Amino acid sequence: MRKVLITGTGGNLGGKLVHTFAKVPWCEKVVAVARPSSFADGRFANIEKVEPLPLELTSASDGEIGEAVALADTIVHFAVVNALPDATWEEAASSFMMTSRLLFAARDRGLKRFVFASSNHAVGALKEVHETLAPGSLTAERVAPGTHWETLDGCMIGYGYGSAKIFTERMCVAAAQRDGLSTVSIRIGWCQVGENLPHTLNAGGNPKLSADKQESKSSNSDLRWFRNMWLSNRDFDNLFERAVLADAANWPQPGIVINGVSANSGMAWEIETAKQLIGYRPQDDVWS
């Protein structure tokens, strides 16, 4: 039985995972961490096995973080200061510092698994050349931050957000070299709010983009890039369940980085490593 602390549960992905883990038999307790304002609507209040924990991780004391970590044996970390790729360098640096404090608190208190929600934006600059990438060639060893995407104010480049994800991946790998901690950093593709259907993916890669702007500013090439990184809801569930439960004994090292997308036909993303190392079994294809 596992006790799992999930951060960022006021957001899309963290909220999804709370509901998923609350239903699985192997999870004894879910500690749902979010900013205090996120619990104003009473979320998770009546869900069996879920313990809501209002905590602002960016300003919490070391003692408060330590007390939170002590409630679980596993951490799944989604929380960021700004969850969109338009994050400033200051916001990205604050997210990195928050994660480092949580990660090392977990290691110092003897937790066995830390799962970090990294992002496709770690290689976002490859969107501009993705048509040249062979299927399955985009491994999690590649780094190329700087997604170009359209906003209502024009084109922006997400250097800070993607760079912070890369640095945190490396920190997780380094932290796992001692004291029995194992880490899994997952470069999550695109898993939308709610039903998360393929036909609602847009070519701008930005949920704030208007329909008119999508039509006038986005290319078919951009649409293929974003659709090929789709992660369905049930594949998301399987991916994170396996990231928590997989035995690290046969990994090449105790800290690993993997891609997290569905089995989308013809995509550049490589997911064989995720299948082999954690037993990921995707069932969906954006093109089917």
Question: Which residue ranges define each predicted feature?
Answer:
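N-terminal Rossmann NAD(P)H-binding glycine-rich loop of SDR-like oxidoreductase domains
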Residues: 4-26
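Conserved glycine-rich Rossmann-like NAD(P)H-binding loop of the short-chain dehydrogenase/reductase
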Residues: 25-40
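NAD(P)H-binding glycine-rich loop region in Rossmannoid oxidoreductase-like domains
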Residues: 49-97
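Active-site YXXXK catalytic motif of short-chain dehydrogenase/reductase
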Residues: 95, 157, 161, 165
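Conserved Rossmann-fold NAD(P)-dependent oxidoreductase catalytic core, especially the SDR/UDP-sugar
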Residues: 101-158
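Conserved beta-loop-beta element that borders a ligand/cofactor-binding pocket
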Residues: 159, 168-194
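Alpha-helical substrate-binding/gating segment
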Residues: 173, 191-194, 199-221, 230-254
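Conserved C-terminal active-site "lid" loop/helix of NAD(P)H-dependent oxidoreductases
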Residues: 254-281
